[in-house]
């Protein structure tokens, strides 16, 4: 059993994700958690600011000797995917070797990089080390509205190496501030992520529709799609649309809502099957929540804020950047190569479905290529 009141935790990578997860560190370790945390940054930028803000030890540079002294029960890795191999080979592997020579217990490693896969950590660190890879829920509040009930984090691990006793409980406790925990196979997690990123492109759909509706048109388009989706799926919805859509507006965009939702959903359901071939129940949990969350953002946040948010997510070479490029290309393709992305007010559900499905597929393939390096 893990004694959370005495356990330590180290965070390698105190950037955006490292800071975002601070409530999770507190929930996991409990009272007095500040005295049992070590956070590590690559440089000393903002070092003093972060120390004053959080009140726990934060250092810059090589942390191997501090890890040996602290011997944390939990080791959180929140560096960028392209940095992960260097951190694991240069710091984590030597630390694990030290523990092994000492006959000391191994930490549970929690990685926040979407790649590499959990099996890679097993190959590099050994079968006595357990690693979980987490795609955390990124929002529990939007525009002042509590969306905790819609938030879900995806967790994967090496399916060939069962988690040790207490690890599932520890992960659930750790992620509790961020909503539900969905345990997935690596393949399923990638398919669900591809679906979610495709739903993220609702931003671009509503941006493109803004011209049809005038001032506030982006939020209005999102409100119409939101009302359609909640009504079709029989969900109450967290908030009323910005303006209650007229029936004519709903008829105008019904094809787009249904096709966009079902295309990415069917891709994830088909590519996220369990090892026995059965469809995963996680897709039915995540899809309506993700669709609603993105449409809520469009109704409750400014377009400028959302454009910056999308830009931040679309890191060079990543899956979201791929989605943005393919979104524009696929719409231009169905419009006969017309320059620019114009979303028609009239269309067919099959057209929206086809673009959504193909977009999820392209994003998925980018994710697989990133996993393979």
Model-derived regions, located:
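NAD(P)-dependent Rossmann-like dehydrogenase/reductase catalytic/cofactor-binding core
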Residues: 1-7, 227-373
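Active-site loop-to-helix "anion-binding N-cap" substructures in soluble metabolic enzymes
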Residues: 204
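A charged, well-structured terminal subsegment
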Residues: 161-185, 311, 319-327
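Small-residue helix-packing motif on alpha-helices
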Residues: 37, 47, 67, 84, ...
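Conserved Rossmann-fold dehydrogenase catalytic segment
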Residues: 140-141, 176-201, 214-257, 279, ...
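Structured catalytic cores of enzymes that bind and process phosphorylated ligands/cofactors
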Residues: 14, 189-192, 314
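NAD(P)+-binding Rossmann beta1-loop-alpha1 motif at the extreme N-terminus of oxidoreductases
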Residues: 1-74, 174-177, 211-217, 270-276
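Rossmann-like NAD(P)(H) cofactor-binding subdomain of soluble oxidoreductases
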Residues: 21, 54, 58-170
């Amino acid at each position: 059993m893990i004694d959370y009141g005495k356990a330590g935790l180290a965070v390698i990578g105190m950037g955006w994700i490292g800071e975002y997860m601070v409530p999770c560190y507190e929930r996991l370790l409990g009272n007095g958690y500040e005295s049992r945390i070590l956070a590590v940054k690559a440089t000393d930028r903002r070092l003093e600011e972060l120390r004053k803000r959080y009140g726990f030890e934060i250092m810059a540079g090589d942390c191997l000797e501090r890890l040996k002294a602290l011997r944390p029960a939990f080791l959180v890795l929140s560096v960028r995917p392209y940095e992960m191999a260097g951190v694991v080979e240069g710091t984590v592997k030597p630390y694990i070797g030290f523990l092994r020579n000492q006959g000391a217990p191994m930490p549970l490693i929690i990685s926040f990089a979407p790649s590499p896969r959990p099996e890679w950590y097993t190959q590099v660190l050994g079968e006595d080390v357990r690693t979980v890879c987490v795609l955390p829920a990124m929002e529990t509040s939007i525009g002042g509205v509590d969306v905790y009930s819609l938030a879900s984090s995806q967790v994967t691990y090496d399916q060939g190496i069962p988690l040790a006793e207490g690890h599932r409980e520890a992960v659930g406790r750790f992620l509790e501030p961020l909503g539900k925990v969905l345990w997935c196979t690596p393949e399923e997690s990638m398919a669900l992520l591809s679906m979610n990123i495709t739903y993220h492109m609702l931003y671009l759909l509503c941006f493109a529709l803004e011209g049809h509706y005038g001032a506030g048109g982006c939020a209005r388009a999102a409100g119409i799609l939101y009302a359609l989706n909640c009504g079709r799926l029989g969900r109450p919805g967290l908030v009323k649309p910005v303006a209650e859509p007229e029936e004519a507006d709903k008829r105008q965009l019904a094809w787009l809502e249904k096709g966009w939702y079902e295309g990415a959903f069917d891709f994830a359901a088909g590519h996220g099957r369990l090892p026995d071939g059965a469809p995963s129940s996680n897709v039915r949990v995540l899809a309506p929540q993700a669709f609603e969350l993105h449409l809520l953002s469009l109704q409750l946040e400014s377009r400028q804020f959302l454009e910056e948010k999308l830009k931040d997510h679309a890191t060079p070479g990543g899956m979201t950047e791929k989605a943005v490029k393919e979104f524009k290309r696929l719409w231009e393709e169905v419009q006969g190569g017309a320059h620019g992305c114009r979303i028609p007010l009239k269309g067919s559900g099959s057209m929206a479905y086809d673009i959504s499905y193909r977009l999820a597929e392209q994003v998925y393939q980018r994710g697989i290529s990133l996993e393979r390096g």
